[in-house]
């Protein structure tokens, strides 16, 4: 009897079937969003309502859902001047956030973000480097439904050294609170190079068709992850400047069958 109990206790472990193994989580595309950016600082002409109407027509044709703009000039107290931010928001039926960089005698300069999705919050930061004058970074958190998307619209100091640019990028990276959340940076970003301060970003230029990157008025970097990837990218010419356009895929984890 003792021998029988000993053999029973040493019997082979039960066979594990495929159905007993937990299913692996696979990212599943749940939403695609189109993000674009443009820098108006080099436009050099007064922007009229008709210019904004034509620009809006292009945005609608391209189905842009989030737009980051740099180099905006506003005259809020001059009634004869068309306000770019307010007029574009009306034309596109978009929410918007504006980050003022400087105000000189009623002439405001700054950056903005427009979105068809609700804007949760916005925050502005100045750059603490010697070459900075009035340059700032505008961070906007957008509720895209399946997850929040963070967009930064910025003008970096034009005369910044390599070390100063690295410090500016660290300032921008501080906006990113969750490593898995979609994070996009737009503006006069430097030519991408491998360094500890830049390696957390991916330059959209690698996804653009050959030659089109030279047309960009505003560059786009992003933090790529398993749940946030570029689907396609291109540039689009407009009278106000060349748009950099990126379609991003937002993914969620789903179990395999």
Regions found by a protein language model. Give the residues of each.
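Metal-dependent catalytic neighborhoods of phosphoester/phosphodiester hydrolases
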Residues: 72-90, 106-108, 194-200
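Proline-aspartate-enriched helix->loop->beta-strand connector
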Residues: 63-72
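Active-site regions of metal-assisted phosphoester/phosphodiester hydrolases
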Residues: 11-62, 95-98, 102-257
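Sec-dependent signal peptide recognition
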Residues: 1-2
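Hydrophobic alpha-helical segments
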Residues: 33, 65-66, 86
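A generic structural signal for ordered alpha-helices
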Residues: 66, 92-93
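C-terminal motif of bacterial Sec signal peptides marking the signal peptidase cleavage site
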Residues: 7-9
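Glutamine-centric residue-chemistry signal
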Residues: 70, 84, 164-168
